[in-house]
Amino acid sequence: MINRALISVYNKEGLLELAQFLKNKGVELISTGGTYKYLEQNDIQVTEVSKITGFDEILDGRVKTLHPVIHSGILAKRDNKEHMDTIAKKDILPIDMVVVNLYPFFDKVDDNITFEEKVEFIDIGGPTMIRAAAKNFKDVIVVTDVGDYSKLIEEIDSKGDVPYDFRKKLAGKVFNLMSAYDGAISNFLLEEDYPEYLSLSYKKMDNLRYGENPHQSAAYYTATAGTAPMKDFTQLNGKQLSYNNIKDMDIAWKVVNEFEEICCVAVKHNTPCGVALGKDLYEAYVKTYECDPTSIFGGIIAVNRKLDVKTAEEISKIFVEIVIAPDFDEEALKVLMEKKNLRIIKCSVKPTNSMEIAKVDGGILVQSADDKLVENMEVVTDKKPSKEEINNLIFGMKVCKYVKSNAIVVVKDFMAKGIGGGQVNRIWPTCHALDRAGDGVVLASDAFFPFNDVVCEAAKYGIKAIIQPGGSVRDKDSIEECNKNGISMVFTGVRHFKH
């Protein structure tokens, strides 16, 4: 039996309908501050919490419900005679329902406000009440999610009360919410990349149809705080995004944003299969397509400029899963939308280079992003690369960062003509990339050459310049082979393994 409900919410969505429903069922409503005023202004009879506690709100509203009368009314076990006798002697009435949503710390932590102002959005009274109610869920219904109001109304209307399973689920949602809420506050105050206890605060954005494969279930969660591209994008067209789509989008968007120049990238199975720069998007796309006309089929296209109609028409000639761009011309959008299943993604948020997390069985690995590229290039051969070759080398190394190790990228005219990766030795991806390219000017490697075989193979294909981190005990062998074949080579001192 629900006789008394305490309501204290920041988000007033759906509140009037719920409050009126409870009132019609004969439930006494107790409320605080802004919620009390809101209900009263909308002609819903409500008792202010200070009338129950005999204690006015103080400290600018910081202390409203932190009172034994409130928490005894919530925590008293109805089937415990001693509990009920105690609160009866103290003239404390049981509270049967707690409806609370918290100060929006998740949102405010990223606002352009002072540190002190952000601290004021750390809720204290709300979490205390809902944790108490959740602990005593058999006797007290606790509601923290506006999305549960309709289900709550339905249950009470049809059954006169809320069944155990739903009460338990609502209680579980409290601790689920508090885990994320406290985690966000902890991260805000600590400002540490590697704290003693790692709190990850994410909220479910969508249930996905399946995971990497149809027999795997999956969901998509986004960070509760901060702005990031794979959180703050807009889908303008097409089917629901899949697990694999989102992973591929992430890589594609990171690659294309490595470049200030006009760039296009094609991604397939979480690996770039074509990357190119151009004087305009049309040229960049055509060059990207020519990198690998076979693998681009069914892939993802990303560009770093507003997509124009000419490029959209060219993209529409083949089947791709997704097109992602910072914006779209109106005519370009019309062309792409003719394919009703094509997922069109608008994203204007740059990659964050945030901490990277990998799950292992029983733990997680955390590392900083691989955001270092070339600090000091050292020419180690007799021949020096030309300025054009240096720029192509840097282009190739930027692409290498996103290819699974061992990674080799062959470049000509700012076009990744050959991409080889994911092999357990370095010569196999070298042969694959050179064979794919047919001809190229420069070659980039994500790690050093353990032997001179990569240089020997590159020489057969007329490679003019090579970029690699260096650091092998046999660097001398590779340098000698370059000198023998008139190839210039530079060391960066920066490795880019990707597992």
Swiss-Prot record:
> Which PROSITE patterns is this protein grouped with?
MGS (PS51855)
What GO CC terms are in its UniProt record? cytosol
Pathway given for this chain reads: Purine metabolism; IMP biosynthesis via de novo pathway; 5-formamido-1-(5-phospho-D-ribosyl)imidazole-4-carboxamide from 5-amino-1-(5-phospho-D-ribosyl)imidazole-4-carboxamide (10-formyl THF route): step 1/1; Purine metabolism; IMP biosynthesis via de novo pathway; IMP from 5-formamido-1-(5-phospho-D-ribosyl)imidazole-4-carboxamide: step 1/1
- For this UniProt record, give its keywords in alphabetical order, as a comma-separated list: Hydrolase, Multifunctional enzyme, Purine biosynthesis, Transferase
| Spans traversing the lipid bilayer | none
Domain (MGS-like): residue spans on this chain = 1-144
The protein's Enzyme Commission number: 2.1.2.3, 3.5.4.10
Per its UniProt record, what SUPFAM superfamilies does this chain match? Cytidine deaminase-like, Methylglyoxal synthase-like
Name the catalysed reactions.
(6R)-10-formyltetrahydrofolate + 5-amino-1-(5-phospho-beta-D-ribosyl)imidazole-4-carboxamide = 5-formamido-1-(5-phospho-D-ribosyl)imidazole-4-carboxamide + (6S)-5,6,7,8-tetrahydrofolate; IMP + H2O = 5-formamido-1-(5-phospho-D-ribosyl)imidazole-4-carboxamide
Q: Write one Gene Ontology MF term.
A: phosphoribosylaminoimidazolecarboxamide formyltransferase activity
- Biological processes, Gene Ontology terms: 'de novo' IMP biosynthetic process
Listed InterPro entries: AICAR_Tfase_dup_dom_sf, Cytidine_deaminase-like, MGS-like_dom, MGS-like_dom_sf, PurH-like
Q: Which residues form the signal peptide?
A: none
**Which PANTHER family does the annotation name?**
BIFUNCTIONAL PURINE BIOSYNTHESIS PROTEIN ATIC (PTHR11692:SF0), BIFUNCTIONAL PURINE BIOSYNTHESIS PROTEIN PURH (PTHR11692)
- Per the similarity annotation, which family is this? Belongs to the PurH family.
HAMAP family registered for this protein in UniProt:
PurH
Q: What is known of its domains?
A: The IMP cyclohydrolase activity resides in the N-terminal region.
Q: What is this protein called?
A: Bifunctional purine biosynthesis protein PurH
Q: What is the organism of origin for this protein?
A: Clostridium kluyveri (strain ATCC 8527 / DSM 555 / NBRC 12016 / NCIMB 10680 / K1)
